[in-house]
């Protein structure tokens, strides 16, 4: 008489259940996005909703705030995006696009959820009014200031020397 223990199908089912038990936790872990991945997904959403002609790409991501471990809790985010040369209608990833020279820069704040299954974000972006100092402008302004200061010093030396020259009375 054959017992269930001798059945080859029971061994296979046991193996399948064991493998499923090992794979399921990996699938759950894979559904949690990193902070940066969640922000990049939010930028994809911003690009889809945008009425602007070109795509935006992440320019600067503020440091990740300390957060709890629950991926379903909204996490605060703040970052800056800049306009790229790629049209919004392209199928290209924004990360593959170059920034547009003098492209529009936007400051974005809001919340994201790290649970990939929920894929939720609430972000608002406004034109960034902060001035980004370009190296060329910095050096030009520094050169102008040094030039003005140099002229002022030369004039003071000339004035000093003129006062040293003995005056002759006519």
UniProtKB/Swiss-Prot annotation:
<dbReference type="GO" id="GO:0005615">
    <property type="term" value="C:extracellular space"/>
</dbReference>
<feature type="signal peptide">
    <location>
        <begin position="1"/>
        <end position="30"/>
    </location>
</feature>
<dbReference type="InterPro" id="IPR018216">
    <property type="entry name" value="Cathelicidin_CS"/>
</dbReference>
<dbReference type="GO" id="GO:0031982">
    <property type="term" value="C:vesicle"/>
</dbReference>
<dbReference type="GO" id="GO:0050830">
    <property type="term" value="P:defense response to Gram-positive bacterium"/>
</dbReference>
<keyword id="KW-0732">Signal</keyword>
<dbReference type="InterPro" id="IPR001894">
    <property type="entry name" value="Cathelicidin-like"/>
</dbReference>
<dbReference type="InterPro" id="IPR022746">
    <property type="entry name" value="Cathlecidin_C"/>
</dbReference>
<dbReference type="Pfam" id="PF12153">
    <property type="entry name" value="CAP18_C"/>
</dbReference>
<dbReference type="GO" id="GO:0061844">
    <property type="term" value="P:antimicrobial humoral immune response mediated by antimicrobial peptide"/>
</dbReference>
<dbReference type="GO" id="GO:0001530">
    <property type="term" value="F:lipopolysaccharide binding"/>
</dbReference>
<dbReference type="GO" id="GO:0042119">
    <property type="term" value="P:neutrophil activation"/>
</dbReference>
<feature type="region of interest" description="Active core">
    <location>
        <begin position="150"/>
        <end position="162"/>
    </location>
</feature>
<keyword id="KW-0399">Innate immunity</keyword>
<comment type="similarity">
    <text>Belongs to the cathelicidin family.</text>
</comment>
<keyword id="KW-0165">Cleavage on pair of basic residues</keyword>
<keyword id="KW-0964">Secreted</keyword>
<comment type="function">
    <text>Antimicrobial protein that is an integral component of the innate immune system. Binds to bacterial lipopolysaccharides (LPS). Acts via neutrophil N-formyl peptide receptors to enhance the release of CXCL2. Postsecretory processing generates multiple cathelicidin antimicrobial peptides with various lengths which act as a topical antimicrobial defense in sweat on skin. The unprocessed precursor form, cathelicidin antimicrobial peptide, inhibits the growth of Gram-negative E.coli and E.aerogenes with efficiencies comparable to that of the mature peptide LL-37 (in vitro).</text>
</comment>
<dbReference type="GO" id="GO:0050829">
    <property type="term" value="P:defense response to Gram-negative bacterium"/>
</dbReference>
<feature type="propeptide" description="Cathelin-like domain (CLD)">
    <location>
        <begin position="31"/>
        <end position="131"/>
    </location>
</feature>
<keyword id="KW-0391">Immunity</keyword>
<dbReference type="GO" id="GO:0045087">
    <property type="term" value="P:innate immune response"/>
</dbReference>
<keyword id="KW-0929">Antimicrobial</keyword>
<protein>
    <recommendedName>
        <fullName>Cathelicidin antimicrobial peptide</fullName>
    </recommendedName>
</protein>
<feature type="disulfide bond">
    <location>
        <begin position="86"/>
        <end position="97"/>
    </location>
</feature>
<keyword id="KW-0044">Antibiotic</keyword>
<feature type="disulfide bond">
    <location>
        <begin position="108"/>
        <end position="125"/>
    </location>
</feature>
<keyword id="KW-1015">Disulfide bond</keyword>
<dbReference type="InterPro" id="IPR046350">
    <property type="entry name" value="Cystatin_sf"/>
</dbReference>
<dbReference type="Pfam" id="PF00666">
    <property type="entry name" value="Cathelicidins"/>
</dbReference>
């Amino acid at each position: 008489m054959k017992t269930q223990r001798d059945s080859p199908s029971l061994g296979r089912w046991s193996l399948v259940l064991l493998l499923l038990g090992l794979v399921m936790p990996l699938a759950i872990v894979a559904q949690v996005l990193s902070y940066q991945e969640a922000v990049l997904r939010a930028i994809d959403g911003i690009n889809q909703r945008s009425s602007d002609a070109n795509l935006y790409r992440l320019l600067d991501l503020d440091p990740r705030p300390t957060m709890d471990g629950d991926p379903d809790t909204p996490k605060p985010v703040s970052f800056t995006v800049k306009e790229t040369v790629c049209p919004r209608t392209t199928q290209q990833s924004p990360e593959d696009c170059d920034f547009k020279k003098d492209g529009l820069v936007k400051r974005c704040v809001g919340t994201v959820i790290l649970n990939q299954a929920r894929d939720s974000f609430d972000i608002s972006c406004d034109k960034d009014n902060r001035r980004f100092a370009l190296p060329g402008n910095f050096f030009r302004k520094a050169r102008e200031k040094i030039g003005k200061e140099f002229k002022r010093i030369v004039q003071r030396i000339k004035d000093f020397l003129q006062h040293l020259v003995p005056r002759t009375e006519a």
